[in-house]
From Swiss-Prot:
Native source species: Shigella boydii serotype 4 (strain Sb227)
Cofactor(s) demanded: pyridoxal 5'-phosphate
Subunit structure as annotated in this protein's UniProt entry: Homodimer.
Recorded family membership: Belongs to the class-II pyridoxal-phosphate-dependent aminotransferase family. Histidinol-phosphate aminotransferase subfamily.
Keyword Transferase appears in the UniProt entry: yes
Protein's name according to its UniProt entry: Histidinol-phosphate aminotransferase
Cysteines paired by S-S bonds: none
Gene3D superfamilies named in the record: Aspartate Aminotransferase, domain 1, Type I PLP-dependent aspartate aminotransferase-like (Major domain)
ATP-binding is among the record's keywords: no
Known EC number: 2.6.1.9
Keywords associated with the record: Amino-acid biosynthesis, Aminotransferase, Histidine biosynthesis, Pyridoxal phosphate, Transferase
Catalytic activity: L-histidinol phosphate + 2-oxoglutarate = 3-(imidazol-4-yl)-2-oxopropyl phosphate + L-glutamate
Length: 356
């Protein structure tokens, strides 16, 4: 009998899997972290729940009710999870048969859709976006056979633009009775008028992903939400872990979603948007910057001359950006999180010093 290694015992798809390269996994020794679309300063909370000897609620009532009120939906239409990333995976586990069904997404976009499907053993199909980063609806239609879940990020990470709402409607009609359409709204607080939450009554196969990681300044909390019709939520409840949120996480999330917490979040959003516009204006005047793309988020995508050299130069100065060169159609592009005014100035000064 031949000796089998631990790796040999693993599933083939896991052995072949390339893990998602998160900002933290990529590392760096910087002091200006502008690579993960986090809020630049910490928000303080006081824990009020001390019953840590007891298991938490599966779906903490205060968190669900507060989020439902904030999002303008019914509590029965809300599922809370360990970040929106868990929501991505739950939808695949609930709706896709490994080896039979597929998911579909449209690069350049968020990398976890593909990683989650590959981990589970579900086929990934991609339809690249058009030159303006809008959906290629004909391309999607041509590949829909056997697809159970379609992921669309809007505003899209890393490009920063909204998907045309009429294209969303066309996609929802194309998939009616065939597949779940998932609108990833991780950055929707920066453009709340574009949310599809009001469409849930019209489209029973629509699901929406949300998070507290961005505008709520709670990336370290790992708390996300899926908004969907009750039939979808009930199916997701069958596959979610029994205690997805710890008691401290639920405690802080409920506070962040209180009326005072919502007001504070909106103040942060206004501050970030103002800083974003200042940074965009400055970037457009810098010689090594070829193009700055419009953004509806807390980050900016820009195309640079000699982007790899620029990325390394700033990295060496402790300014950590996100390199997007490996994403389809993003050659020469770097993504810059909008930070504090001081952090923006560090970026501007460093880029102005680059030799073109």
């Amino acid at each position: 009998m031949s000796i089998v290694t631990i790796t040999d015992l693993a599933r083939e798809n896991v052995r072949n899997l390339t893990p998602y390269q998160s900002a933290r996994r990529l590392g760096g020794n910087g002091d200006v972290w502008l690579n993960a679309n986090e809020y630049p300063t910490a928000v303080e909370f006081q824990l009020t729940q001390q019953t840590l000897n007891r298991y938490p609620e599966c779906q903490p009532k205060a968190v669900i009710e507060n989020y439902a009120q904030y999002a303008g939906v019914k509590p029965e239409q809300v599922l809370v999870s360990r970040g929106a990333d868990e929501g991505i995976e739950l939808l695949i586990r609930a709706f896709c048969e490994p080896g039979k069904d597929a998911i579909l997404y449209c690069p350049p976009t968020y990398g976890m859709y593909g990683v989650s499907a590959e981990t589970i053993g579900v086929e990934c199909r991609t339809v690249p976006t058009l030159d303006n980063w809008q959906l290629d609806l004909q391309g999607i239609s041509d590949k829909l056979e056997g697809v159970k879940v379609v992921y669309v990020c809007s505003p899209n990470n890393p490009t920063g633009q909204l998907i045309n709402p009429q294209d969303f409607r066309t996609l929802l009609e194309l998939t009616r009775g065939k597949a779940i359409v998932v609108a990833d709204e991780a950055y929707i607080e920066f453009c709340p008028q574009a949310s599809l939450a009001g469409w849930l009554a019209e489209y029973p196969h629509l699901a929406i992903l949300r998070t507290l990681s961005k505008a709520f300044a709670l990336a370290g909390l790992r708390c996300g939400f899926t908004l969907a019709n009750e039939e979808v939520i009930n199916l997701l409840m069958k596959v979610i872990a029994p205690y997805p949120l710890s008691t401290p996480v639920a405690d802080i999330a409920a506070q962040a979603l209180s009326p005072q917490g919502i007001v504070a979040m909106r103040e942060r959003v206004a501050q970030i948007i103002a800083e974003r516009e200042c940074l965009i204006a400055a970037l457009k005047e810098i010689p090594c910057v070829e193009q700055v793309f419009d953004s509806e988020t807390n980050y900016i995508l820009a195309r640079f001359k000699a982007s790899s050299a620029v990325f390394k130069s700033l990295w060496d100065q402790g300014i950590i950006l996100r390199d997007q060169n490996k994403q389809p159609s993003l050659s020469g592009c770097l993504r810059i999180t909008v930070g504090t005014r001081e952090e923006s100035q560090r970026v501007i000064d460093a880029l102005r010093a680059e030799q073109v």
